[in-house]
Amino acid sequence: MKNIILASASERRQELLKRILEDFQIIVSDFDESSIPFKDNIPSYVMNLAEGKARSVSKKIMDQDSNLVIGCDTLVAFNNKVLGKPKDKKDAFEMLQALSGNEHEVYSGLAILDVKSNKIITDFVCTKVKFSKLTSLQIEKYINTGDPMDKAGAYGIQGKAGVFVENINGCYYNVVGLPLNKLNSMLMEMGVNL
């Protein structure tokens, strides 16, 4: 059995991976996301970011050849504009105000790299999420919890912002940060049967 390494500091991703894998390591990627410019193709962009994270971690473990490294990146898109993590409370407010009453997309790029063979597979998942109309007070109260500050699009569906979601079309776990169904099929493609 290959050793599985998650190239992420995200507690949400770690919790989700524990649902399908009993044993894996965490090695945080030091990949510079700004090294990949966004060029209007969101699926390609998130897959490139995920691959960058996986390759960054693989360089740290070159002496261990029975490893598979999982890289993942999630972002929110609204009107073909990428919404990353908010810079500050004002930025979070503007993001949530834009999403209010509207549908947006959540994209996750996945990359799985076999360190020994250097074989890599990448894929992505897109989930459509529609928010109810939010009041300024709702947005401010949510921002004051601190919850949105480390999340793409300034919200976490698994937390208090779950009440903002009117409907979802696609993988719920993708919106949380790790699309388990897609990850499972990619792991199977790399010879890992869960």
From Swiss-Prot:
This is dTTP/UTP pyrophosphatase. Keywords: Cytoplasm, Hydrolase, Nucleotide metabolism. GO terms for cellular component: cytoplasm. It catalyses: dTTP + H2O = dTMP + diphosphate + H(+); UTP + H2O = UMP + diphosphate + H(+). The active site is at D73 (proton acceptor). Its cofactor is a divalent metal cation. Transmembrane segments: none annotated. The keyword Hydrolase applies.
